[in-house]
UniProtKB/Swiss-Prot annotation:
<keyword id="KW-0808">Transferase</keyword>
<keyword id="KW-0411">Iron-sulfur</keyword>
<dbReference type="InterPro" id="IPR015422">
    <property type="entry name" value="PyrdxlP-dep_Trfase_small"/>
</dbReference>
<dbReference type="Pfam" id="PF00266">
    <property type="entry name" value="Aminotran_5"/>
</dbReference>
<dbReference type="GO" id="GO:0031071">
    <property type="term" value="F:cysteine desulfurase activity"/>
</dbReference>
<feature type="modified residue" description="N6-(pyridoxal phosphate)lysine">
    <location>
        <position position="204"/>
    </location>
</feature>
<keyword id="KW-0001">2Fe-2S</keyword>
<feature type="binding site">
    <location>
        <position position="181"/>
    </location>
    <ligand>
        <name>pyridoxal 5'-phosphate</name>
    </ligand>
</feature>
<dbReference type="GO" id="GO:0044571">
    <property type="term" value="P:[2Fe-2S] cluster assembly"/>
</dbReference>
<dbReference type="InterPro" id="IPR015424">
    <property type="entry name" value="PyrdxlP-dep_Trfase"/>
</dbReference>
<keyword id="KW-0408">Iron</keyword>
<feature type="binding site">
    <location>
        <position position="153"/>
    </location>
    <ligand>
        <name>pyridoxal 5'-phosphate</name>
    </ligand>
</feature>
<dbReference type="InterPro" id="IPR000192">
    <property type="entry name" value="Aminotrans_V_dom"/>
</dbReference>
<feature type="binding site" description="via persulfide group">
    <location>
        <position position="326"/>
    </location>
    <ligand>
        <name>[2Fe-2S] cluster</name>
    </ligand>
</feature>
<feature type="active site" description="Cysteine persulfide intermediate">
    <location>
        <position position="326"/>
    </location>
</feature>
<dbReference type="InterPro" id="IPR010240">
    <property type="entry name" value="Cys_deSase_IscS"/>
</dbReference>
<protein>
    <recommendedName>
        <fullName>Cysteine desulfurase IscS</fullName>
        <ecNumber>2.8.1.7</ecNumber>
    </recommendedName>
</protein>
Length: 403
């Protein structure tokens, strides 16, 4: 077993060797520009791009013509939300999203607010799922777009996309879904799902970083205002020379995901259950997010009376995160856990374990023993733990104000 043990697959995944192997020729001999229509170098590259587009479409049961290449899910979220909001703004300027969305959605919404759009940010229920009645109640005559992620990056809960999309359809609201964390983890069938726009990323699914895609429904046709101009690539929606090697990598990664997903999810579920069972007998341990409506890859746990930062320092041999990688550089408690109603203390003491393709039972057992040992040691030196063990209710303690 190599240290540190990587249990942070929701931050990024390694590129599958099969994916890397497929990419390499497009960095060396097959280096043509897919937009070069006058020679075989261009034709070869274009064929590779279209094959990859088909593989991405197949994983989510879409038409390849509905797949637009982008630089990743962040760009896809921006193109979908800004593109639709700006194109349809004569219909209305009200948007709906959820407080636990990824920053790529929340910051895009904030940006639109600064240009005159109005956004409703819904609170999730305590289990992290969206209250469908609250969602329905938030829709107004001028609501043009709603954005709800399929799988949450911090707590792994799966939203009821079919039901939310159904409500959007009833009210003529365009529905965008960030599915960066969903591909290869849950079945996605865009023939059936009432979804208009869906964002994908390669690097959460064992593909390379720097490449993603946006699904844009053709029937009924969804129109977007392009955010990137210059050459009219991707049917005018996203200009810029296509990164053939990245695209080939994403196609292969999504092909592998389609073929291996069912068996892989079962294996990961067993490992997640093993991890949960190993930590479940500890005192004052709380699971964040619904355990049923959840991908098997994610376990987000708060260890009460342990300071999150000191726990992270103590478990250096485990690559895990507290909060999302995009925001874990800040010392703020996770905004996702705060939105679930967790106290600052519990939000601060949370660890996100995310398992993946190369996680073994040995890795999980190592994580269990390391966490148990370090949490016990940190609690030994914690006055709060001592007070808790003495039966003092810390919520009723009157702390003296600092002078």
């Amino acid at each position: 077993m190599k240290l540190p043990v990587y249990l942070d697959y929701s931050a990024t995944t390694p590129v599958d060797p099969r994916v890397a192997e497929k990419m390499i020729p497009f960095l060396t001999e097959n280096f043509g520009n897919p937009a070069s229509r006058s020679h075989t170098f261009g034709w070869t590259a274009e064929q590779a791009v279209e094959n990859a587009r088909e593989e991405v479409a197949k994983l989510v049961n879409a038409d390849p013509r509905e797949i637009v290449w982008t630089s990743g899910a962040t760009e896809s979220d921006n193109l979908a939300i800004k593109g639709a909001a700006e194109f349809y703004q004569t219909k209305g300027r009200h948007l709906i999203t959820v407080k636990t969305e990824h920053k790529a959605v929340l910051d895009t919404m904030r940006e639109l607010e600064s240009s005159g759009f109005e956004v409703t940010y819904l609170e999730p229920m305590a289990n992290g799922l969206l209250d469908l009645d609250a969602f329905r109640a938030a829709i107004r005559p001028d609501t043009v777009l709603a954005s709800v992620m399929q799988v949450n990056n911090e707590i792994g809960v799966i939203q009821d996309i079919a039901a939310i999309g159904g409500i959007c359809r009833e009210h003529g609201v365009i529905f965008h879904v960030d599915a960066a964390q969903a591909t290869g983890k849950v079945e996605i069938d865009l023939e059936q799902l009432p979804v208009d726009l869906m964002s994908f990323s390669a690097h959460k699914t064992y593909g390379p970083k720097g490449i993603g895609a946006l699904y844009v429904r053709r029937k009924p046709r969804i129109r977007l205002k392009a955010q990137m101009h210059g050459g009219g690539h991707e049917r005018g929606l996203r200009s810029g020379t296509l990164a053939t090697h990245q695209i080939v990598g994403m196609g292969e990664a999504f092909r592998i995901a389609r073929e291996e997903m069912a068996a892989e999810n079962e294996r990961i579920r067993r490992l997640r259950d093993r991890l949960l069972a190993g930590l479940a007998d500890m005192e004052e341990v709380f699971i964040n997010g619904d355990l049923e409506q959840r991908v098997p890859h994610n376990l987000n746990i708060s260890f009460n009376y342990v300071e999150g930062e000191s726990l992270m320092m103590a478990i250096k041999d485990l690559a895990v995160s507290s909060g999302s990688a995009c925001t874990s550089a800040s010392l703020e408690p996770s905004y996702v856990l705060r939105a679930l109603g967790r106290s600052d203390e519990l939000a601060h003491s949370s660890i996100r374990f995310t398992l993946g393709r190369y996680t073994t039972a040995e890795d999980v057992d190592f994580a269990i023993s390391l966490i148990k040992d370090k949490v016990a040691r940190l609690r030994e030196i914690s006055p709060l733990w001592e007070m808790y063990k003495d039966g003092i209710d810390l919520n009723t303690v009157q702390w003296a104000a600092a002078h």
